[in-house]
């Protein structure tokens, strides 16, 4: 009995440590989704998206707050991309003549990629694939909503499905907007800065709220006006890669500021990080808005549409990891 208790406590401790870091926390994910809803509503002249901003903000938190509770082993690797690991392997294969410089391995399906690049484990991240798989589902739902002869009850069911899938896509997109979610040095463990992950995305963002809200809205409006035309001509994968690359470029600055700023001096720390947080949340919201916009060409029926799901059913990845993939150390992993 004692052995079982010790084992249970050990597993619980591992689970708590590996799950403890959520990109942007509740506030950041919710804010980015609400901003995206505003952008889509304005650009499509459909108030439906703005009126459902609360719903979308909630669903944007579902992958962390709901799905990780029941499907952690197959879910957690979908929340990040350790880009350095991928880049090193791609470069090596190009040098060995095993990969053409013109090939983009990210365009492969999850199953094909896992087969060809079996030495890049799931715990290096599968965020790009998660978004693309869910976007296919969002498109299928949008296609059904375009039909004109659907009964009201069925249309409402499909509208709820659209909101849920769109919202959870938002979670993975905004994960990619977080610099510490696109690097193997995700918690500063490689630079003797453990704890920087939750300090940046949880503590700092929580302290910045609510003053940060309007700043993110304004920055997103500016970016949307500037980039929306160019974004419309790019694939979702291209948008994700650009978003992740821009996130990675902010990493050194975050680590530098962390070393210079005492974490317990929150009054100073929040102002040190404010510009970066605003930029990253706005960048994520804009990419998310463009993805939603592509699947918004249908007419909502808002007549007594009160549907809401507190705990949406888990949506499986196309290829779940063959066996549970524990985090490599007690250090929090996205």
Task: Please state what every model-predicted region is.
Residues 21-164, 168, 179-334:
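N-terminal, motif-rich segments that launch catalysis or mediate targeting to/interaction with membranes
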Residues 176:
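SAM/dcSAM-binding transferase cores
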Residues 5-16:
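Bacterial N-terminal signal peptides
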